[in-house]
Each structure stands twice: as C-alpha cells, then as structure tokens.
C-alpha cells in the first residue's frame, strides 16, 4: 500500500500522500501539489484526491526525469480562501528560504514557493561512504543523533559541536 510521504513506483511514477487531520478531527477542503514542474501554480492536474477513511490527500504523477531533483509543496485550503503551504513531513530533503542562503552549493529558493520546500529524486545518488570498513555490531541497539550545527552551538560549526560531545554522551 501507499505510505504517507513520497512513494516511488516501479513504473517510474511517484505517489504523494499527505495526512490531513487536526486535533479537532477537521481536514482542509482541498489540496494541490505545486512544484518545479508546474511553476508553483495551483493547476487542475495537481489537484489531490481525498481519502476520507485515511484522512489522506494523494496523487500519482509521472513524466519526471528520474535523475533530476524536483522541489514541491502541498497547497492546502479551506472555504475562507487562505491557502497554507507545507512541506512533506516525511521528506528527506528540505529547502529553507531563510537559512539556505548561507549554505554554499544550495540552489536558489524557487520563486513562487512559500515556507519550507520538500524535494525528491527518483534515482537518488548513492552516498559515497568514506569509511568502507565500518560495521554496526547490533543495529537494534543504536542511538543516532541528527544535529544542525548552526542551531546546536553558538559557534555554528563542527568544532562547537565536538566541544559538546560530553553533553551528547550524557543524553544516553
């Protein structure tokens, strides 16, 4: 079955599924997927289908270049007409218009996009491991931390994070 987030299909198409239910049990009235491929515009072909039994908006799209990265957002709305733009909470890549400008090599934030932007690529490049002899003793006994240096340390760099390794070790 389809999972929430980005689903890569065997035929090269991609299915997007977005859970939409708030604490009061309400959902938005419509959802469109907007992105690089449709100039960030709300178009009929980006209108997502509603599955009320799963509280999920979904759509399957094709025609993507498998080796190209595409950026997108979900554009949700209600009868009030005020749309909300959100990234996919399950995405592996997020572009941030407020912070990415300070990071070398990150593409310019797309015109027409708002807030955080998700990205996907069908043929994702394989990560080039630097230490090929690394072995995990017990993958069920791992503690993995993900850290954004600029938010974790006042110096905003790896040296500042390394100075805090005792703190991280004390976390467990």
Predicted regions and their residues:
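Non-catalytic, glycine-rich low-complexity segments
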Residues: 1-26, 107-110, 133-134
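Hydrophobic core residues within well-ordered beta-strands of beta-rich domains
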Residues: 12-14, 70, 143
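Aromatic-rich carbohydrate-binding modules that target alpha-glucans
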Residues: 13-67, 77-99
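Extracellular/periplasmic catalytic domains that process cell-envelope and extracellular macromolecules
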Residues: 25-26, 65-66, 136-140, 169-170
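Aromatic- and glycine-enriched glycan-recognition loops and surfaces
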Residues: 53-67, 149-172
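Core domains of carbohydrate- and sulfate-ester-processing enzymes
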Residues: 72, 76, 80-131
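Aromatic-rich, solvent-exposed beta-strand/loop patch
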Residues: 129-143, 148
